[in-house]
Amino acid sequence: MEQAKVFFTDFRCHPGVNQQQKLEKLLLAAGMDTIDFEGKIVAIKLHFGEVGNLAYLRPNYAKTVADFVKARGGRPFLTDCNTLYIGSRKNALEHMDAAYLNGFSPFSTGCHVIIADGLRGGDDVEVPVVGGEYVKYAKIGRALMDADIVISLTHFKGHEQAGYGGALKNLGMGGGSRAGKMEMHAKGKPHVITSKCVGC
């Protein structure tokens, strides 16, 4: 597999140049202007954040990407799948409340929020994972599968199991329905190698 190209911009701004303009330059440098968005439904997959948390990309970045897509004839929407754990994103009603409270509304971003795996996280599509060692079929949120184009808008963060999380986790785990997340997490159960166990 070919290595991915990584495009970088810093947060330093000066009069006349803001972070949203820098993001648009980044989208152009990455070649996103070569994508045929005309008439296409475009899922912008991101993490809306838990209520009271600030560890998510700000809505103005989502607006920049949505405006970029709309300027090229696309029809964007913001999306994520429900979570397994107890929190403010475990069902679509609470998830949308969290999105709106954290600033991701149609008024601030210029596009709608659709929870990809439905009201209770059961609206999914089984996708075969060719050569999958741990998962043979991935259960992906239906709205992601129904979109013509998917854009991953991701923040980079530390992760307790993987070391760090980013674009792969945003799509791989974040794109999974609640049932899909359950299957992925179930494979990570600890097991005891009895011959090496010291009974600690």
Indicate residue ranges for each PLM-predicted region.
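N-terminal and secondary-structure boundary signal
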Residues: 1-200
